[in-house]
């Protein structure tokens, strides 16, 4: 009897171990520190080759972690950039916190200031940005009332960014001029629209690769919401996704959403938590997929850059 009890308990233990195996993290993989000695890392973004760019914001520089595993400086100074995102043309969009602007940076590191205010009022401080993928739409006949016909054409998607208020010691500006909102910048890079006005402190933001859904974290209220994106960038069908806010966000090939703060919390598309990734830092700011195969999860956390090998991979919209 004692033998059978021991056998049964052993089988239970094995079953528990198997049940605990992650469906998204590569077998045997652990969080590895790739680089350190930074002041505060933020805004990781992956280019088309798989290189990951991130900011060391207090030191006013953008760094590059190459696919070959080497660290280099891409831009210094960089307007104290925070959140970053690449567009399809290879430009790097940056939330330039020094003067509360939105920048577009070319491959040589030359920046263009795209936005610096909204209807004459200064932004609080653009924080995180997501570039909506281009989408295909059928052309129309000469009559606007006719249904779409003919070949499909590619339509640029524009971009969304959050604008919370975090007072910086280096600001020389006056007091806060606007509420903390979320904005949509149309593909002409001139027309900007306020699309979310009812959140306490919007921060992390990410969308799906088909450009249909947008996730926005209200870090001030400790919640994350999901919205449906209309063709003109307007948002509808607001729905609570999970009871957790986030500093930064990304999405994987299975539609799972990654939230940051105390480590990395992963939720499936239904909003159920499926994984908690512990990071040996006081605060985890942001996250993205990178590498040649997009199967390395890059984590910017306080003084370090970390990596974790995954089973799932990143998508173009992350």
Predicted regions and their residues:
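Bacterial N-terminal signal peptides
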Residues: 6-16
């Amino acid at each position: 009897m004692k033998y059978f009890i021991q056998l049964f308990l052993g089988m239970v233990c094995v079953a528990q171990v198997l049940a605990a195996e992650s469906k998204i993290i590569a077998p045997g993989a652990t969080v590895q520190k790739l680089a350190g000695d930074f002041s505060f890392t933020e805004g990781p973004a992956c280019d088309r080759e798989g290189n990951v760019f991130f900011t060391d914001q207090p030191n006013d520089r953008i760094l590059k972690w190459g696919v070959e595993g080497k660290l280099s400086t891409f831009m210094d100074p960089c307007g104290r950039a925070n959140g970053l995102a690449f567009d399809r043309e290879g430009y790097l969009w940056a939330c330039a916190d020094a003067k509360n602007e939105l920048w577009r940076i070319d491959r040589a590191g030359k920046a263009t200031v795209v936005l610096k205010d909204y209807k004459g009022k200064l932004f609080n401080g653009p924080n995180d940005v997501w570039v909506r993928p281009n989408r295909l739409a059928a052309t129309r006949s000469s009559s606007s009332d006719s249904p779409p016909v003919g070949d499909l054409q590619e339509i640029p998607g524009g971009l969304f960014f959050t604008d919370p208020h975090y007072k910086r010691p280096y600001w020389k500006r006056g007091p806060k001029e606007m509420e903390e909102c979320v904005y949509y910048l149309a593909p002409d890079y001139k027309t900007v629209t306020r699309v979310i006005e009812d959140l306490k402190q919007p921060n992390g933001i990410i969308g799906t690769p088909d450009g249909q859904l947008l996730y926005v974290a209200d870090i001030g209220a400790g919640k994350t919401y999901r919205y449906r994106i209309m063709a003109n960038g307007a948002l509808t069908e607001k729905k609570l996704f999970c009871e957790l806010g986030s500093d930064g966000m990304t999405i994987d090939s299975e539609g799972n959403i990654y939230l940051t703060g105390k480590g990395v919390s992963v939720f499936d598309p239904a909003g159920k938590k499926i994984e908690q990734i512990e990071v040996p830092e006081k605060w985890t700011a942001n996250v993205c997929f990178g590498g040649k195969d997009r199967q390395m999860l890059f984590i910017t956390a306080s003084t370090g850059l970390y990596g974790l090998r995954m089973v799932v991979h990143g998508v173009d919209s992350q």
